[in-house]
C-alpha cells in the first residue's frame, strides 16, 4: 500500500463528462489498494461536493480556479515562451496548498492529472525530492494543437484561431517534452497517444496505457425516459471545449441542413455545460435544444434515436463514445471521433467523414429502428471492457514498478 497525493484540475465529483469522469474512476481504483489524499481546484459555477470523495480519500480544501482575463492570456501569448495551457491553472494558492501538503505528510507518489498541472513538477521536486511523480496525460496536447492548426488553416474565417495554434505548437512541444522527461512514470489513454508522446519523451521513460473508463452499469437505464430528454439526435460534452465547439458547428452548418431537408421534424439536443458564445444562437434554430449543464446525461442517452460524434480535431479517446455505447446508443461518428478504439465500422458504430455520408448514415438509422437496436446492443457489449474495475490491475502495475524496493 502506498500513500498517494492526487492532483486534479477540478473536483472529480460528480463524475460528469471528460476529465472529472476519468479522474473519479481512477480515484476509485487507487483507493481500493492505496491511501489517497486529494487536492483539486474548485470551479466557481458549481458547488463543491466532497462527501462522496471523502469516502475514497482525504480531501484537502479545494482551491479556486484562477481567473485569467483575455488580456492576461494575450500577454502570455505575445511575451512568454510558455504555452497558454501551462498558465491556465497556474495558481499561487494551489502551489501553497501543495507545498503545505508535501511538508505535512510523507507521500510515496504524486499523481498529476493532465498537462495543465505539470507546472507543479518542479515544486514537488524541491519540496519532497524522494516523492515519485506520475503524470497522467489525458491527451497528446501537442498533436491536438497541430490538428487544430491544420484544420483552421484551411478556413479563412478561422485564421485567428490558426495563428493562436501556430504560436502554441512549439511551446507546447517544449513544455510537454519537459514534463514527460521529468516525471518518473507516465500514463496515457490510448496506444496512439502513447506513440505520439514517446516521440517527445526519453526512450527509457516508463509509459503505460490506462484507457478511459466508466461505471458501465450506471448507463443501463431502467426507468422511463422523460419527454424532455427524448431527441432524435444527441451530442454530449463540455461545450466550451474547442474540439466539441468545432464538431457541433460543423454538424450544424453542413450536416444538419441535409438531415432536416429529408426529415423536417428531426430534433437534436446538444447536452453539456458552459455552451460557448459561438454556439448560443443554435438554441434558436428549429429543432435544436441547448441544454446547458444537466444533472445526468443518462436520460438523454437513453432517449436518443442516434448519438452523433462529429469530431474533427482532438486526441486521446472520447469518454462520450464509451458513455454512449455503454448506454446502448446507435452511434454515428467521424473516424477521428472513434480513434483509439478497435471498432468495426458498421458493427459497433458507423463511421462517416463527409457531410453527405454522415447525414446519410444518420437518416438511415432514424428510418430503421431494428438496425438501431442491433447496433446499440453490439456497442453495449463492446463498452463492457471499459468498466472502471478493469483499470485497477493496470494502476497496480504502474505503482509496483515505480515503488519497488521502497
Place the predicted regions along the sequence by residue.
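Acidic donor-binding loop of glycosyltransferase active sites
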Residues: 184, 287, 299-316, 327-330
Amino acid at each position: 500500500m502506498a500513500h498517494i497525493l492526487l492532483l486534479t484540475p477540478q473536483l472529480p465529483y460528480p463524475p460528469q463528462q471528460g476529465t472529472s469522469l476519468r479522474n473519479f474512476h481512477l480515484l476509485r481504483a487507487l483507493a481500493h489498494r492505496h491511501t489517497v489524499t486529494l487536492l483539486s481546484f474548485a470551479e466557481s459555477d458549481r458547488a463543491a461536493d466532497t462527501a462522496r470523495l471523502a469516502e475514497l480519500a482525504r480531501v484537502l480544501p479545494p482551491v479556486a480556479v484562477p481567473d485569467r482575463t483575455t488580456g492576461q492570456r494575450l500577454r502570455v501569448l505575445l511575451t512568454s515562451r510558455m504555452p497558454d495551457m501551462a498558465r491556465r491553472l497556474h495558481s499561487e494558492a494551489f502551489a501553497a496548498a501543495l507545498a503545505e501538503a508535501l511538508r505535512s505528510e510523507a507521500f510515496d507518489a504524486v499523481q498529476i492529472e493532465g498537462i495543465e498541472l505539470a507546472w507543479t513538477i518542479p515544486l514537488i521536486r524541491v519540496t519532497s525530492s524522494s516523492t515519485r511523480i506520475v503524470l497522467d496525460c489525458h491527451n497528446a496536447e501537442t498533436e491536438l494543437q497541430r490538428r487544430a492548426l491544420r484544420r483552421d488553416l484551411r478556413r479563412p474565417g478561422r485564421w485567428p484561431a490558426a495563428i493562436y495554434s501556430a504560436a502554441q505548437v512549439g511551446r507546447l512541444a517544449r513544455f510537454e517534452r519537459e514534463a514527460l522527461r521529468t516525471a518518473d512514470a507516465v500514463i496515457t489513454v490510448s496506444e496512439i497517444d502513447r506513440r505520439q508522446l514517446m516521440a517527445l519523451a526519453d526512450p527509457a521513460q516508463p509509459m503505460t496505457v490506462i484507457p478511459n473508463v466508466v461505471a458501465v452499469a450506471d448507463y443501463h437505464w431502467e426507468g422511463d425516459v422523460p419527454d424532455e430528454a427524448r431527441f432524435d439526435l444527441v451530442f454530449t460534452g463540455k461545450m466550451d471545449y474547442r474540439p466539441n465547439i468545432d464538431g457541433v458547428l460543423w454538424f450544424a452548418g453542413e450536416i444538419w441542413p441535409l438531415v432536416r431537408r429529408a426529415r423536417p421534424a428531426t430534433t437534436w439536443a446538444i447536452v453539456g455545460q458552459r455552451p460557448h458564445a459561438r454556439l448560443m444562437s443554435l438554441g434558436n434554430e428549429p429543432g435544436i435544444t441547448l441544454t446547458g449543464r444537466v444533472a445526468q446525461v443518462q436520460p438523454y442517452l437513453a432517449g436518443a434515436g442516434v448519438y452523433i460524434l462529429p469530431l474533427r480535431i482532438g486526441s486521446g479517446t472520447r469518454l462520450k463514445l464509451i458513455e454512449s455505447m455503454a448506454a446502448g446508443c446507435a452511434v454515428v461518428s467521424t473516424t477521428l471521433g472513434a480513434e483509439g478504439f478497435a471498432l468495426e465500422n458498421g458493427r459497433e458504430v458507423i463511421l462517416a467523414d463527409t457531410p453527405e455520408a454522415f447525414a446519410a448514415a444518420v437518416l438511415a438509422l432514424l428510418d430503421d429502428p431494428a438496425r438501431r437496436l442491433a447496433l446499440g446492443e453490439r456497442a453495449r457489449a463492446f463498452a463492457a471492457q471499459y468498466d472502471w474495475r478493469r483499470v485497477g490491475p493496470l494502476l497496480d502495475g504502474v505503482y509496483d514498478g515505480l515503488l519497488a524496493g521502497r
